[in-house]
């Protein structure tokens, strides 16, 4: 996408290209990269080019991993390793090689291997399920998920740790990196405690479980066996390595610390979070475009003049507005152009959309910029060395520093999580407007497709989304403000990056549920708009028919046309104001709204034969009765046709712009039908027979978001 930034020449405003990497371009690039890995391309570990997409591919989709074993890479590691062996042989004092750890670095030893064992021993302190046997008391939380990391987090951490070690700054052997990859490739995953890391000297304890697996510590358990939904088999690491013919690797000096001292777990969880955050922030723009259609809003709110010229923040005014504007091309539901009207013609109606639509680019844009900033930071973290000490193989110098301090990850996650809340808040505001008959431009209350007295369809969703956005607000609270001094006050400041990344994944889960709920009601609203459009077309014919039948002998053709248009306008206005009524009552009220127009018309100078006025007025009641009856029958027929699928699985498609691809994915691919068939049949078969529950349909959409099945649809909207 070409972005523009305003400027001026001789005082005349103009726009010029602005070099900015858009969220959309990053999403498309990442999506294509992920697809290549899923198609068989190996993730390359070279210390420089690891991407969020690559981490996602290896962590979630079991993509193969290939080490860059070029002579240069091997030589770099060999030089770094030689520095360590030389220091050991010469008796040089080096942190973690001859000293204790952290606040205990004042101790000394000439036993580096035993020192490594002591390091692993004291870090293997996490709380995990002690047995897989059934409990004799029901737990308050799931014993596994409440204490144990998901496998995808651990797999991502193993990949990132290899990518850091291969840079040659850690003093480890090539064989160590190969062994991690061998374990990863065999789909043997350490069981790692969920809690216990403050991400200060890296994620020490979680990484110690990877080290414990490599040395076949029988106290460390691993997942293994066929991949399946849910938990796999767990066994002691020693048994699993034997089963898969993997030789344990006795660690050499400094290698215990080389594995533990890094930010791999924080970076892994952050990478997985950002992969989904980019998708959801783009999906929010698609939802806003669909919301504009569903609410009969105006495309003009996203006009380039407002955003690319007047206030050209890159992510905000330019990208978000451009995407939404483009998605609304050729929509028959959104107003594509502002139409100037007389002040009396739009009296008592809003002249512009409310804030949730009209200011969506301004609200979404800063979130896009923050997520892009986080993406840059986490990508850099995945391609950095986060050890201490660091080894310069060229000079032989050992540097004592603090690259393990993961505040870069924390900041990235804090801003991402806050952005997710703001996205959720915007979509919540749109959704509450959509289900409210006083705000949704003529849609029925709770988006009921049948008589609203016995159909409260989206009311539960309206309540639930309030709970979701409230939880997002709670989760958006910074984690870093809760940093505590730790480890003998040596780690007096720390990052809590892993905790922050975990909280961000929680936010993503809540936001994806909220978005699934919104997409569900958007599809319902769009179907109702299509139904209304067909109803208005039918109503126009009914009015014309009844005018000719009842008043034809009193009116000329031009008078019939004039009166018909006026009556249709009045009845459309009445329909919008009476959506809380059941169908029959609404049609009676709508037909009754024509009375004044008839009286005004036949009492005007246009109707010249005053002697017939009494006869004409007597026929108005008959006209109202006929129109009300036929309109009620038409509405009932349309409801039956739409709900039964006679109008197709996706009846609103022809009315929509580019957003129809997402709508069709929900309606056709996922099989989520328009709601209301049980209500139309007056629950003759009870609940859950003719249709699944509302929650089951929303769950299908949520799973498509969560599992990445919706990403190809979003990508296709922009390519």
Curated annotation (Swiss-Prot):
Pfam families for the chain: Lyase_aromatic
- The active site is formed by 95
Q: What is its main location?
A: cytoplasm
| Kinase is among the record's keywords | no
Q: How is it modified after translation?
A: Contains an active site 4-methylidene-imidazol-5-one (MIO), which is formed autocatalytically by cyclization and dehydration of residues Ala-Ser-Gly.
- Listed name of the protein: Phenylalanine ammonia-lyase
Q: For the modification 2,3-didehydroalanine (Ser), which residues carry it? A: 201
**Keyword Hydrolase included in the entry's annotation:** no
Q: In which pathway does it act?
A: Phenylpropanoid metabolism; trans-cinnamate biosynthesis; trans-cinnamate from L-phenylalanine: step 1/1
**Which reaction equation describes what this protein catalyses?**
L-phenylalanine = (E)-cinnamate + NH4(+)
